[in-house]
């Protein structure tokens, strides 16, 4: 059993984050499961390096709900990867989808992702943000685990290990991990990268707004035609 050090209370987030920076990712997870609000859950895109957080969380909470937002436009490889990891890690997978199908949305609005930044934002709200917000509410999630890392993009450099959003706490236990840390964890535990990783895809979302990394590109340029990096979930929830 992991013995956790005495840490500041949740209502002193600034001091708490300073202390959490000194702990391992494993101890951060244990702390959040023990001291955080009820009904923890993990969100996962089943993207390039998603196996790390899925493995890390289920080591300590085997039955934790794993939320996947299925936009209807994921890569076929992503659906198969989700099946593979769900079977291997015995995941308690909870799939949430938009209130309207992609075909219905296209009939109403056209291909929103081809309509500039405003269209992309509207698409993300309908197909990503709303389903995730609904999942968190229906599952009554008090402690929300994410795989956000500071090194992923310029929009994530200030990611705290714990944040408060209304009455919910958002926990990013590998916020300070580097790509090397990810690789070492995956190698040690024999975890797979997403099948598209070997084809140059370093950040994997929807099939129509994801590109492989090419010379001269930043990782964040591979999403949403370079307009933005975030899909809205971690900006708006």
UniProtKB/Swiss-Prot annotation:
Catalytic activity line of the entry: [thioredoxin]-disulfide + sulfite + adenosine 3',5'-bisphosphate + 2 H(+) = [thioredoxin]-dithiol + 3'-phosphoadenylyl sulfate
Enzyme Commission numbers on file: 1.8.4.8
Name of the protein this chain belongs to: Phosphoadenosine 5'-phosphosulfate reductase
Any one Gene Ontology molecular-function term assigned to this protein's record: phosphoadenylyl-sulfate reductase (thioredoxin) activity
Gene Ontology biological process terms, A to Z: hydrogen sulfide biosynthetic process; sulfate assimilation, phosphoadenylyl sulfate reduction by phosphoadenylyl-sulfate reductase (thioredoxin)
PANTHER family, per database record: PHOSPHOADENOSINE PHOSPHOSULFATE REDUCTASE
Gene of this entry: cysH
Alphabetical UniProt keywords: Cytoplasm, Oxidoreductase
Top-level taxon of origin: Bacteria
């Amino acid at each position: 059993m992991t013995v956790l050090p005495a840490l500041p209370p949740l209502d002193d987030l600034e001091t708490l984050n300073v202390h959490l920076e000194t702990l391992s990712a494993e101890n951060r997870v244990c702390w959040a499961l023990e001291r955080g609000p009820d009904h923890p859950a993990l969100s996962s895109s089943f993207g390039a390096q998603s196996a790390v957080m899925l493995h890390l969380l289920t080591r300590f909470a085997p039955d934790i709900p794993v939320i996947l937002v299925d936009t209807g436009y994921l890569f076929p490889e992503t659906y198969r990867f989700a099946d593979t990891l769900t079977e291997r890690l015995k995941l308690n997978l909870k799939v949430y989808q938009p209130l309207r199908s992609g075909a219905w949305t296209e009939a109403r609005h056209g291909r929103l992702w081809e309509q500039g930044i405003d269209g992309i934002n509207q698409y993300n709200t309908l197909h990503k943000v709303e389903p995730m917000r609904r999942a968190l509410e229906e599952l009554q999630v008090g402690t929300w685990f994410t795989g956000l890392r500071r090194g992923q993009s310029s929009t994530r450099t200030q990611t705290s290990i714990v944040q408060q959003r209304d009455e919910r706490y958002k926990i990013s236990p590998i916020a300070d991990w580097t790509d090397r840390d990810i690789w070492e964890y995956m190698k040690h535990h024999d975890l797979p990268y997403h099948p598209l990783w070997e084809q140059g895809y370093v950040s994997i979302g929807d099939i129509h707004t994801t590109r492989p990394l090419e010379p001269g590109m930043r990782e964040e340029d591979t999403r949403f035609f370079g307009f933005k990096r975030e899909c809205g979930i971690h900006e708006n929830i």
